[in-house]
Amino acid sequence: MTTNRIPVAADHGFAPRRVALTIGALAGAVLIAYANTWSVPFLFDDIVTIVDNPTIRSARPWSSVLSPAAHTGVGGRPIAHLSLVCNYAIGGEAVAGYHGVNLALHLLSGLALFGLVRRTLLRPALAPGLGSHAGAIATAVAALWLLHPVQTQSVTYLSQRTEILMALFYLCTLYCFARGAEPPGRPGWLAASVLSCFAGMASKEVMVTAPVMVLLYDWVFVAGSVRSAWQARWRYYPIARS
């Protein structure tokens, strides 16, 4: 399978300005869809994870931030715990601040999905049939992700910060890999993919499946076979899997 990079210009002029307009439209749609959620109170696990959790009230000692206790609801999830520490440092228990961060993370995951879908459709195997519509298709997929009702629990239920962070880092892992796999090879993007994978694993345990998904993506859209994928990026996969 050829791996020549298809230029963004092949996407019927889906230029940076249009990308910026798309991002603005998606952000506006998210804000409208969740406009009535800013005052949703702390519920259920939020009480243990946020309201009654003394470990988010200080960033010291640093070891406690990176190793939250199991009873806090974010045990073994230091990135999620760190985000709550930062939330509390800025706004205390003001619920709107936590909703704002959840919405921002949700939007970022949608944008990562937009970039992943668009670049995938511009790959040589798909570009002849779908490349000219890559931007529009990616926008539709991202909008569906951002606005689908199934997302409301992870966005508005504040202790589900772990889920949102995991989704964001999962998509960033795939997006950065897609960028890194473009010829002539971009090791910086592959390194960013590995870092995103590590961050996701520090947010929620299900992230452990990400390296498998990256290998499947490599097989289907880039290398054409598992053997070719391994031969081309044998240094990458053991690190990502670890």
Predicted regions located by residue number:
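Polytopic membrane enzymes that build or remodel cell-surface glycoconjugates and lipids
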Residues: 1-242
